[in-house]
Amino acid sequence: MALLLFNDHYYGFLHKYKRHTGSYDNLFNLRCSKEDHYLNSLDAIWLMGCCEEFTDPALRAHALAIATESNIGLVNNNAVISDERLKCWLCKKPSHQQTEHLKLILLPNLVNGFQFATESYHICLKDHSGDDPTQYLSEFSFPTGLRAYYKPHQKMEHKHIVVTNGIPISKNFNEIALPDPSPSDDYVLVGAHECPILM
């Protein structure tokens, strides 16, 4: 592992093709789980076998080293990973509403990190991505009484925002400003309210 160094160009390919950049980061932060090893190996093989732009011999050698290191990590860890854990739970959740970039997921029972919540939502990018979804938050408009919270250092690859009327009990959440309501003929239904989408 001492000979394997973080490669910005390789990371750029992972980001460009929406692969698992968080798992690649974890390999060098020494926090690599079995899932991370699996995803790193999968991404390296995918880049070498399926990406036509991935032709640089040095990058291909790096991908081979990543795949080898990750496969060694998998062999050394005998725990079995269920298929469900390898799939992104945000991608699997049905969307309550969608905008151009974002997906709104209804949370009927928000208990982790909040109390007294009666109306709650997850907001994430429609496509699996580690990009910050807060930059597109103006695509939604919410009624008063709801607040948005974001963890800047989320462990998950698919970043998300929690919008709720609950009270946060964890200090890990940063409150972010929701956009001001604006009149429109197009609506997103949030709870019992009709909320305009900003186009």
UniProtKB/Swiss-Prot annotation:
**Superkingdom of this protein's organism:** Viruses
A Pfam family this chain is assigned to: Tenui_NS3
Q: Where in the cell is it found?
A: Host cytoplasm
Q: Which InterPro entries does the record match to this protein? A: Tenui_movmnt_prot
Q: Give me the Gene Ontology terms describing cellular component.
A: host cell cytoplasm
Per UniProt, the keywords (alphabetical) are: Host cytoplasm
Protein name according to UniProt = Protein p2
State the taxonomy lineage.
Answer: Viruses, Riboviria, Orthornavirae, Negarnaviricota, Polyploviricotina
